[in-house]
Amino acid sequence: MNVLVYNGPGTTPGSVKHAVESLRDFLEPYYAVSTVNVKVLQTEPWMSKTSAVVFPGGADLPYVQACQPIISRLKHFVSKQGGVFIGFCAGGYFGTSRVEFAQGDPTMEVSGSRDLRFFPGTSRGPAYNGFQYNSEAGARAVKLNLPDGSQFSTYFNGGAVFVDADKFDNVEILATYAEHPDVPSSDSGKGQSENPAAVVLCTVGRGKVLLTGPHPEFNVRFMRKSTDKHFLETVVENLKAQEIMRLKFMRTVLTKTGLNCNNDFNYVRAPNLTPLFMASAPNKRNYLQEMENNLAHHGMHANNVELCSELNAETDSFQFYRGYRASYDAASSSLLHKEPDEVPKTVIFPGVDEDIPPFQYTPNFDMKEYFKYLNVQNTIGSLLLYGEVVTSTSTILNNNKSLLSSIPESTLLHVGTIQVSGRGRGGNTWINPKGVCASTAVVTMPLQSPVTNRNISVVFVQYLSMLAYCKAILSYAPGFSDIPVRIKWPNDLYALSPTYYKRKNLKLVNTGFEHTKLPLGDIEPAYLKISGLLVNTHFINNKYCLLLGCGINLTSDGPTTSLQTWIDILNEERQQLHLDLLPAIKAEKLQALYMNNLEVILKQFINYGAAEILPSYYELWLHSNQIVTLPDHGNTQAMITGITEDYGLLIAKELVSGSSTQFTGNVYNLQPDGNTFDIFKSLIAKKVQS
């Protein structure tokens, strides 16, 4: 499910960053946290796939102006569908029934009713004087009282007090200001409530609404980058000592909305990067020397102080060491307590008498095991770059062309156990945990086939890569062909939902998984995403250089399911049938099998074209005879029958109205329209035959 953070008129870059990063820390991998604009919230079918919508800090009035078209959708999402609305600071003002901001100040006053009305009363602010737009001048570490009697301080800059919150039956006060605000917190009596509400939780229909005046989502790690010395000394230093309490509070309030949060505090901090280890297949050691020569050509030079070589690439800087044992301590210590996106990345090449790093340096990925299962004749994957904690296996290659162009053609696989800046479609980033195997393969393709002399369409690479991964899973060991995993066009892997399997009392062992008999839709979703592919294309030495970035849920179930879960389910069936149990799945073997299949499939495609590969693809995709609606053509119903061999578009034949078997003769080519939630809800169709 998605958690959508509004990023549009009224937001500030800093507030969006804090909200996104903080929510990812607490909610991933159970939810996919990403930013959206008004157009997405107005036009795309996001509600059925979303658990929460978040409005971060900024300015309330632009929210009112820009978001008027989506007010009714937000209210329906919360009250009717049981969704969660979260408003931090300006988002908190936006979610109330009335705003009174800086009353009496002719330069800043904003007063008026608000249409969301999740909180039935007034939000009044700034709760404390001194606020200035786009400034830290009025910022402070504000002390909050919690219901259990404890206190902690968090960042505050212009937020509201929720007036008379204790008088509303549907409102729970989660935190109050320890010091009386500078504005009236009550409209009765002396004008001050004994419990001036700073954070409230409202029950609205079937849903929950969390509104805050202060910024408990603000991470002190990002605030340390401020150049304001006074702010650093008076606010940031105070907040550093409060970080554990802030984390506990955030988890508490997010959990109260019904969201599923991580249980480990270590998960909410980006861990230190670890060294990257470069190794080769035993018979491909010459590729290591070729890469080092290429790096020198691109400017790698010796650093006699650090006893390493350095390369200042396009986005990142790199330090290259030689010798796993000799260099590990120095390479590791240079990464400690450094921001992952700012520190030079360290890469260790083997020493003269070394082949594979000692296992104690890579306890979560046995590189020797990987090369054991890699075909000896393989070029793809014959160089392995592994890091336990990396920024992103894709971004580090995609953003540093001098590094990328130093890699021998079609050789490298980059694997990471934990990504602190994992990258997905639309530029989304996240921290992926252990149990989600992230990898990026670097493959090179000619512009034309050496056999047929036909131009090669690189769009097919995403199909071929998913086909290779699917084949690797199903051939992992005897019995793995029963795992119900299939390809969702164009580049995702989906598995049958364990919940659906149990509800329907299905049996899969030795029966053959017939995915065509199961529904592919939202009414009763039978499938869950377990893997996605991101392809980045470069042009190097008159050839395509393609980065195939893929993450797959091996053992981590959040937010969907995993391969290991399905192995466990099938083993329950096998035990009842007195069959040998399936082995646990290991990232090392799976990655090697993926490379083996990719090598074979790519060669077939390059030499003989898409026609050679598509029959295998059709056997493992979800869409044979799927019926789709074409909104650009009067909501015509059409049946998917295949993929074009030139540009990889879907082929759909128009159905006679009311029939699921008879065709009109009209044929359409279909492609996605960029819809980030359900590509089959909004396909762009071009008629190619009538």
Swiss-Prot record:
It is found in: Cytoplasm. InterPro entries: aa-tRNA-synth_II/BPL/LPL, Biotin-prot_ligase_N, Biotin_CoA_COase_ligase, BPL_LPL_catalytic, Class_I_gatase-like. It is an enzyme of class 6 (ligase). SUPFAM superfamilies: Class I glutamine amidotransferase-like, Class II aaRS and biotin synthetases. GO terms for molecular function: ATP binding; biotin--[biotin carboxyl-carrier protein] ligase activity. GO terms for cellular component: cytoplasm; nucleus. Its EC number is 6.3.4.-, 6.3.4.9, 6.3.4.10, 6.3.4.11. It catalyses: apo-[methylmalonyl-CoA:pyruvate carboxytransferase] + biotin + ATP = holo-[methylmalonyl-CoA:pyruvate carboxytransferase] + AMP + diphosphate + H(+); apo-[propionyl-CoA:carbon-dioxide ligase (ADP-forming)] + biotin + ATP = holo-[propionyl-CoA:carbon-dioxide ligase (ADP-forming)] + AMP + diphosphate + H(+); apo-[3-methylcrotonoyl-CoA:carbon-dioxide ligase (ADP-forming)] + biotin + ATP = holo-[3-methylcrotonoyl-CoA:carbon-dioxide ligase (ADP-forming)] + AMP + diphosphate + H(+); biotin + L-lysyl-[protein] + ATP = N(6)-biotinyl-L-lysyl-[protein] + AMP + diphosphate + H(+). Keywords: ATP-binding, Cytoplasm, Ligase, Multifunctional enzyme, Nucleotide-binding. One of its GO terms (biological process) is protein modification process. It holds the Pfam family BPL_N. Residues 378-606 form the BPL/LPL catalytic domain. Post-translational modification of specific protein by attachment of biotin. Acts on various carboxylases such as acetyl-CoA-carboxylase, pyruvate carboxylase, propionyl CoA carboxylase, and 3-methylcrotonyl CoA carboxylase. Monomer. Belongs to the biotin--protein ligase family. Present with 1970 molecules/cell in log phase SD medium. PANTHER family: BIOTIN PROTEIN LIGASE, BIOTIN--PROTEIN LIGASE. This is Biotin--protein ligase. It comes from Saccharomyces cerevisiae (strain ATCC 204508 / S288c).
